[in-house]
Curated annotation (Swiss-Prot):
Top-level division of the source organism's lineage: Bacteria
UniProt name for this protein: Chorismate synthase
Organism of derivation: Streptococcus equi subsp. zooepidemicus (strain MGCS10565)
Keyword presence, Flavoprotein: yes
Pfam family, one: Chorismate_synt
Presence of the UniProt keyword NADP in the record: yes
Catalytic activity, reaction form: 5-O-(1-carboxyvinyl)-3-phosphoshikimate = chorismate + phosphate
One GO CC term, this protein: cytosol
GO BP term (any one): aromatic amino acid family biosynthetic process
Protein residues bound to NADP(+): R39, R45
Cofactors, names only: FMNH2
Known partners and oligomeric status: Homotetramer.
Recorded name of the encoding gene: aroC
Enzyme Commission (EC) number: 4.2.3.5
A GO term for molecular function: FMN binding
Length: 388
C-alpha cells in the first residue's frame, strides 16, 4: 500500500491516489465522510471549519460499493477556493493580482521562511499553502480506508487527549479500551474525564481572548493486533519506528513515545519490562504493557499505545516579530486565520495516520490481492500465534 497527496490550502481541491488496497473491501464515500467530520469537530475550532464541510469524491478503484484492487482516487473540494480564484490561479495573471496577497513577512514556527529559502520563492505563500494542516484532511480520508481494512480483521483504533494546554487529564487506572473509545468520542475535547471539561474549555476561551494558542499530548491506541508484526532484522523494518516517523509528519507534532515513553529514563529495568505470562486458553500475554505493545520493533500482542506531543499552533493573533524578506526590516509576522487549539482534530489525524501504517504493514506481511485471501491468511496467523 502506498499513496500520495496533492493540493494547497486555498487551492481547488485536495487529491490522493492510493495503491494496494485489496479487492473486495466494502467502501463508500459516506464511510470516509464520517471520518472527515470527526476531524472538523472539537472545541476551539475556528472559522475555516464553518466554511468547509469536507466531503470526498471517489473517482476510481471502487465499483458497486467494493474496491477493485485498482488505484483509488480521492478528491476533496476546497469550498473556500471561490474567494481565492485569482490569487491561486493556475494560469499566469496580471502583476497587480499576483501581488494582491503576497507574503513577505514569514510567521515563526511555520514553513514560510525556510520553504521560501529552499525553493527560491519571492512570495512565501507558495510554502504556506502546501505546508498547511489542511493537507491532513486527505490523510484522514486515506486513513478511513485503512481503518475499514482493520475493521474487517477485528482491529480497533481510538485516540484521546492526555494533556490539554498544560492541564493533565485524570484517566482512571486500567480503564478498558472500549470505555476510552466511547468516552473520548462523546467529548468535544476528546478527553475521557467529563468532570474536567468545564475547566479546560474556560482555559481555551481565555487563551483565545489573549490571542494565543495551546498544545498538548495525544494518545492513540490500536487494539486487537497479534504478536509479530514488524521485524527486528533491519532497522527500517521496525514497526514502532515507522509509526514514530508518521506521527512526527503531522503538522505541529514535535515528539513521540510508546508506553511509558520518556518516563523509562527515570526507572530501573525491573520497573519497565513486561513480564511474560501464558495461559492454556489465551496463550502468551504480558502482565503489563509498559513498552506500549512493542519489543524489538515488533508487536507483542498487547495494545499499541503511542503518544504524540503537539506544539501550540504557531499562527498567533498577537503575532511574534519577524523580518520582511524584501526589506529585511523587522515587522510583526503575517496573521492568517487560525484556531486557539486543534488538539481534538489532531487526535483524529494521528489515529488515522497510525492506522494507515498498521494497515500497510499487514498488507505487506500477508497475501492481500483480495480481502478473502487477506482475512484467511491473517486469521490463520492469529490462530497460530494463539497456539504457539
Amino acid at each position: 500500500m502506498r499513496y500520495l497527496t496533492a493540493g494547497e490550502s486555498h487551492g481547488q481541491a485536495l487529491t490522493a491516489i492510493i495503491e494496494g488496497i485489496p479487492a473486495g473491501l466494502a467502501l463508500s464515500a459516506e464511510l470516509i465522510n464520517k471520518e472527515l467530520k470527526r476531524r472538523q469537530g472539537g472545541y476551539g475550532r475556528g472559522a475555516r471549519m464553518r466554511i468547509e464541510s469536507d466531503r470526498v469524491h471517489i473517482s476510481s478503484g471502487v465499483r458497486h460499493g467494493k474496491t477493485t484492487g485498482a488505484p483509488i482516487t480521492l478528491t476533496i473540494q476546497n469550498k473556500d477556493h471561490q474567494k481565492w480564484l485569482d490569487i491561486m490561479a493556475v494560469e499566469a495573471v496580471e502583476e497587480q493580482i499576483k501581488f494582491k496577497r503576497k507574503i513577505t513577512r514569514p510567521r515563526p514556527g511555520h514553513a514560510d521562511l525556510v520553504g521560501g529559502i529552499k525553493y527560491r520563492f519571492d512570495d512565501l505563500r507558495n510554502a504556506l499553502e502546501r505546508s498547511s494542516a489542511r493537507e491532513t484532511a486527505m490523510r484522514v480520508a486515506v486513513g478511513a480506508i485503512a481503518k475499514a481494512v482493520l475493521t474487517e480483521l477485528g482491529i480497533e483504533t481510538a485516540n484521546h487527549v492526555l494533556v490539554f494546554g498544560g492541564i493533565e487529564v485524570a484517566v482512571p487506572e486500567a480503564m478498558p479500551f472500549t470505555d476510552i473509545k466511547k468516552a473520548a468520542e462523546a467529548s468535544d475535547l476528546s478527553i475521557v474525564n467529563p468532570k474536567q471539561e468545564a475547566t479546560i474549555k474556560a482555559h481555551i476561551d481565555q487563551v483565545k481572548k489573549e490571542g494565543d494558542t495551546l498544545g498538548g499530548i495525544i494518545e492513540t491506541i490500536i487494539y486487537g493486533l497479534p504478536a509479530g508484526l514488524g521485524s527486528y532484522v533491519q532497522w527500517d523494518r521496525k514497526l514502532d519506528a515507522k509509526i514514530a516517523q508518521t506521527v512526527l509528519s503531522i503538522n505541529a507534532f514535535k515528539g513521540v513515545e510508546f508506553g511509558m515513553g520518556f518516563d523509562m529514563g527515570y526507572q530501573k529495568g525491573s520497573q519497565v519490562m513486561d513480564d511474560i505470562i501464558w495461559h492454556e486458553t489465551s496463550g502468551y500475554s504480558r502482565r503489563t504493557n509498559r513498552l506500549g505493545g512493542f519489543e524489538a520493533g515488533m508487536t507483542t500482542g498487547q495494545p499499541i499505545v503511542v503518544k504524540g506531543v503537539m506544539k501550540p499552533i504557531p499562527t498567533l493573533y498577537k503575532p511574534l516579530m519577524s523580518v520582511d524578506t524584501e526589506t529585511h526590516e523587522p515587522y510583526k509576522a503575517t496573521v492568517e486565520r487560525s484556531d486557539p487549539t486543534a488538539l481534538p482534530a489532531a487526535g483524529v489525524v494521528m489515529e488515522n495516520v497510525v492506522a494507515t501504517v498498521i494497515t500497510k504493514e499487514i498488507l505487506e506481511q500477508f497475501p492481500s490481492d483480495n480481502m478473502t485471501d487477506l482475512k484467511q491468511a491473517f486469521f490463520a496467523y492469529r490462530d497460530y500465534v494463539h497456539h504457539f
